[in-house]
């Protein structure tokens, strides 16, 4: 059986000598010797294509909604908003490979030509790795925000996040260079896949290990480590807050800490579980197929199809995790989706805004705290610039220090020294 590499690289005919990126499901669909009627294969291909198109539509709508909320309803984007924007963009572009995958399943051949094959596979791979790398970067950012909030404040800014996001896209493009070089539609075949030089088995195995390490196991290790340290930090902080002095003096703070611990724990479980659930079968099937070729029996079609669809389903679920679990995105979605009904309710007597939950209040409090930290950071930077201006000049004159807040600080005029007065009188 040929190796499984990218969700979109799914040839529908089997070439045991050189085909390298074939999905078992789609390869079997193109192989009439599997013992299944051609009519049954055609129906299966059409049904699978319809499922892919549904996943594509849902993913495009969800990620487009996230992108619109970030760009339209975020006046001053935070670090998390920048990463969510890039994640949604990568997931949305990742969805664009599904129509080509659906067409190849329905037609049992690639109708778009060799150049389009190479372009689709390259773009699909870039956005696949960008999506995974964005999840990893967001996990590192959450670790810095929770475990090292003070030391990381100067680095956790929107401009730095944009530069990191640009580096993620460049790194993803570099990682998929082998796809650009070796993908295409070989002569005598009608499918889009990767064709390795001899020895093809060694190249194929090396590429499977390469993509699995960079595309799953490496990011998973970083994500698990970050969230493990976050949980340890939150629990240690909660134990300090649960002290008797805190229970009597800072009861509201204790409650907020407990709610924050529960919220972070739920987010950790959701992120890690979804990531592992959607991507581990994909890469495990790759590795198993290298060690022991997978059977081409119709009984395994459902398993192969599920493994192909799960990575795309992860991109559909990301807007739910990173959008709907955030109060800020909830409000943005409500403004977009419930605008007509909200106008009707606003005309009804006694109607008011919905009551906020404890998590929403905690998130608003956290956003206010982050905004206050950003203002304090800007004030400290202003103080630093003013202190540099107030340093002694080349003539050795010392300027008086300023007092007041950062926004009110201005340099006071210097009093002339005795030498200056004498020099001035000599010129009169």
Swiss-Prot record:
Post-translational modification note: Phosphorylated. Phosphorylation increases upon somatostatin binding.
Disulphide bond pairs: 117-192
Top-rank taxon, per record: Eukaryota
Family in the record: Belongs to the G-protein coupled receptor 1 family.
Cytoplasmic side: 72-81, 141-162, 233-266, 326-428
In-chain residues carrying the UniProt-annotated modification Phosphothreonine: 357
Membrane-related topology note: Multi-pass membrane protein
Subunit structure: Homodimer and heterodimer with SSTR2. Heterodimerization with SSTR2 inactivates SSTR3 receptor function.
Originating species: Rattus norvegicus (Rat)
Record field: compositional bias (Acidic residues): 357-370
Residues that carry a glycan: 18, 31
Keyword Repeat in record: no
Record-given protein name: Somatostatin receptor type 3
């Amino acid at each position: 059986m040929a190796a499984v590499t990218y969700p979109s690289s799914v040839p529908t005919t089997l070439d045991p000598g050189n085909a390298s990126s074939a999905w078992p499901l789609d390869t079997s669909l193109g192989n009439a010797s599997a013992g299944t009627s051609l009519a049954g294969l055609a129906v299966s291909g059409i049904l699978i294509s319809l499922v892919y198109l549904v996943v594509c539509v849902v993913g495009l709508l969800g990620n487009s909604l996230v992108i619109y909320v970030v760009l339209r309803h975020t006046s001053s984007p935070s670090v998390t908003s920048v990463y969510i924007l890039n994640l949604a963009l990568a997931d949305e572009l990742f969805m664009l490979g599904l129509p080509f995958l659906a067409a190849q399943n329905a037609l049992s051949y690639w109708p778009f030509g060799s150049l389009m094959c190479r372009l689709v596979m390259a773009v699909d791979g870039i956005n696949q790795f960008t999506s995974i790398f964005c999840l990893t970067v967001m996990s590192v950012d959450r670790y810095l925000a929770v475990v090292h909030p003070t030391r990381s404040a100067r680095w956790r800014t929107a401009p730095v996040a944009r530069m990191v996001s640009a580096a993620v896209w460049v790194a993803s493009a570099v990682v998929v260079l082998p796809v650009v070089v070796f993908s295409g539609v070989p002569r005598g075949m009608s499918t889009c896949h990767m064709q390795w030089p001899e020895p093809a088995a060694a190249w194929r195995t090396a590429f499977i290990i390469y993509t699995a390490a960079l595309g799953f196991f490496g990011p998973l290790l970083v994500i698990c480590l970050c969230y493990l340290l976050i949980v340890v930090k939150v629990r240690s902080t909660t134990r300090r807050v649960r002290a008797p002095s805190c229970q009597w003096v800072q009861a509201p703070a204790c409650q907020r800490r407990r709610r924050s611990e529960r919220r972070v724990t739920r987010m950790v479980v959701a992120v890690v579980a979804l990531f592992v659930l959607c991507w581990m079968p994909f890469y495990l099937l790759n590795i198993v197929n290298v060690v022991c070729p997978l059977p081409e029996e119709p009984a395994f079609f459902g398993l192969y199809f599920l493994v192909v669809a799960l990575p795309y389903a992860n991109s559909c679920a990301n807007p739910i995790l990173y959008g709907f679990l955030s109060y800020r995105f909830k409000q943005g979605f409500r403004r977009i989706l419930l605008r007509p009904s909200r106008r009707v309710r606003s005309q009804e007597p006694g109607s008011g805004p919905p009551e906020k939950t404890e998590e929403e209040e905690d998130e608003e409090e956290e956003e206010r705290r982050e905004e206050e930290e950003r203002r304090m950071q800007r004030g400290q930077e202003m103080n630093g610039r003013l202190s540099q201006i107030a340093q002694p000049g080349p003539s050795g004159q010392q300027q008086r220090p300023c007092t007041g807040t950062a926004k009110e600080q201005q340099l006071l005029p210097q009093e002339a020294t005795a030498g200056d007065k004498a020099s001035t009188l000599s010129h009169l």
